[in-house]
């Protein structure tokens, strides 16, 4: 049986890029939907609001800054190959380091607290990520609802 080896740094780098990109770039499909909504809007106020949202999205992409001040929590849905081995670290540690780097290096709002019930101390890097894992045959990829990132 063939074993697939993936370096922890590859997982980390992929997660960092995924989270940075999804906070800076809205996606062509959503931009198209916003433009269509603006063009079909009959209310001048509604048209103006949609135009401002579109302009904000263009600025975020051009200047690589977050689309919104609330950049949310890191939630991943991972399909993890049954014959995959992570080298030089663990999968969870690599994912959390990627999230950490994205939120720190990408200037994303860090709002996760370590213990939401008692101490409520901000982790200052938006970790730990919430990782939903499903074991699948032979391949690994990390995705969020509108984007996929495959690790080769």
List each language-model region with its residue ranges.
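Residues forming anionic-ligand binding surfaces in small-molecule and nucleic-acid pockets
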Residues: 71-72, 147
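A generic, well-ordered mixed alpha/beta core segment in the N-terminal half of proteins
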Residues: 72-136
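Charged, compositionally biased N-terminal leader segments and the immediate start
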Residues: 1-23
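Metal-centered catalytic cores of metalloenzymes
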Residues: 22-25, 40
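Flexible, glycine/charged-enriched surface loops at secondary-structure junctions
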Residues: 26-34, 45-50, 64, 105-118
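Translation machinery proteins
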Residues: 40-65, 121, 125
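Single conserved hydrophobic/aromatic residue that forms the stacking wall/gate
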Residues: 140-152
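Cytosolic covalent-transfer regions centered on His/Cys nucleophiles
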Residues: 21, 30, 37, 45-46, ...
